[in-house]
């Protein structure tokens, strides 16, 4: 599914990234593969954003992360910032699957 279609209505995706073909959604960086959308879920013990670079190195094409995450992070892929990562994760998964 195209990134723009997957996020439509919830996340503003820059036009140059809207045509990225997402083949998998992952919140575990160790499971990311080529074509993944990595969702950096903040947690109590650790923060998913700490693992975004690993997900990208494994082939993730974009990252969904909390507001402010893009500042100071140049992962080489779009970082789509959202207010509530867990809420968006459910919506994205529902639309994708």
Predicted features along the sequence, with ranges:
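Walker A (P-loop) phosphate-binding motif
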Residues: 91-97
């Amino acid at each position: 599914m195209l990134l723009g279609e997957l996020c439509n209505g919830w996340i503003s995706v820059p036009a140059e990234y809207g045509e990225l073909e997402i083949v998998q959604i992952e919140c575990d960086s160790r499971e990311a593969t080529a074509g993944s959308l990595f969702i950096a879920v903040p947690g109590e013990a650790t923060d998913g954003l700490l693992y975004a670079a690993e997900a990208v190195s494994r082939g993730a094409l974009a990252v969904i992360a909390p507001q402010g995450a893009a500042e100071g992070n140049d992962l080489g892929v779009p970082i789509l910032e959202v207010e509530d990562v867990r809420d968006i994760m459910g919506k994205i998964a529902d639309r994708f699957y």
